[in-house]
Amino acid sequence: MVNSIFYIIMGPPGSGKGTQSQRLANHLGLPHISSGDLFRSAIKSATPLGSKAAEYINKGLLVPDNLVWEIVQETLNKPGCKSGCIIDGFPRTLDQAVLLNDFLVKSNAADYRVIQLDVSAEEIISRIHSRFICPACNYVYNQSQGFKECPTCHVALIRRSDDSLEVIHQRLESYEKATVPVINYYEDLGKLIHIPSETSPDEVFQSILACTEA
């Protein structure tokens, strides 16, 4: 990979990293790799790895590193990612971060950057508990928007099984425990950029663009 562009978008559940990752991918003309979407696709296809991952995701727990890396690496090795990509939802543990760093360095993509979306726990709980998704296109809607079906796909919106209050708290606890070492790792490497993310999605995106274009 020559002159490839890789951005890793990190943040707690409900921080908007999926939305911002897709917007950045569209802006830069790069693929958007969402580990969550990869897992859900594997689960829907009932692959052996997908079935194992489902047991963890539905309980709000982190998927073991060996399952995560095998799924993500397979996608990163595809021709479409040769010029770079936007990675969302990975890595979530220090071991995953080291594996990804080694992979990117060997792929001549050592000049990657990590964007951390900072959001308070109170805001996260409010966001997640009021969100619904389209099962066809995975677009996320807020309850305050008043939609009962996706305006694009005309499919009824649903709440993900891992968006219940109990599971939200479990996910936040799991995220905090596993991800702090990842943040410290990227800070030590000089890769980390903090973006305050409790403003509007448009304002957050402008802050991200300012960092990527600096």
Swiss-Prot record:
**Which residues are ATP-binding?**
14-19, 131, 140-141, 199
Recorded catalytic reaction(s): these are:
AMP + ATP = 2 ADP
Q: Where is this region: NMP?
A: 34-63
| UniProt KW keywords | ATP-binding, Cytoplasm, Kinase, Metal-binding, Nucleotide biosynthesis, Nucleotide-binding, Transferase, Zinc
What's a single GO BP term from this record? AMP salvage
EC supergroup of this enzyme: transferase
Q: Enumerate the residues binding AMP.
A: 35, 40, 61-63, 89-92, 96, 160, 171
Q: In which pathway does it act?
A: Purine metabolism; AMP biosynthesis via salvage pathway; AMP from ADP: step 1/1
Molecular function (Gene Ontology), one example:
ATP binding
Region span, LID? 130-163
Q: Which residues take part in binding Zn(2+)?
A: 134, 137, 150, 153
Compartments, record wording? Cytoplasm
Please give the GO cellular component terms listed in this UniProt entry. Answer: cytoplasm
One Pfam annotation reads: ADK
User: Key word ATP-binding present in the record?
Assistant: yes
Respond yes or no to whether keyword RNA-binding is given for this record: no
User: Which HAMAP family does the UniProt entry name for this protein?
Assistant: Adenylate_kinase_Adk
PANTHER family xref list? NUCLEOTIDE KINASE
Subunit comment: Monomer.
What family does this chain come from, according to its entry? Belongs to the adenylate kinase family.
Known function:
Catalyzes the reversible transfer of the terminal phosphate group between ATP and AMP. Plays an important role in cellular energy homeostasis and in adenine nucleotide metabolism.
Q: What is known of its domains?
A: Consists of three domains, a large central CORE domain and two small peripheral domains, NMPbind and LID, which undergo movements during catalysis. The LID domain closes over the site of phosphoryl transfer upon ATP binding. Assembling and dissambling the active center during each catalytic cycle provides an effective means to prevent ATP hydrolysis. Some bacteria have evolved a zinc-coordinating structure that stabilizes the LID domain.
* Name of the protein described by the UniProt record: Adenylate kinase
**Organism in which the protein naturally occurs:** Chlamydia caviae (strain ATCC VR-813 / DSM 19441 / 03DC25 / GPIC) (Chlamydophila caviae)
List the taxonomic lineage.
Bacteria, Pseudomonadati, Chlamydiota, Chlamydiia, Chlamydiales
Q: What gene is behind this protein?
A: adk
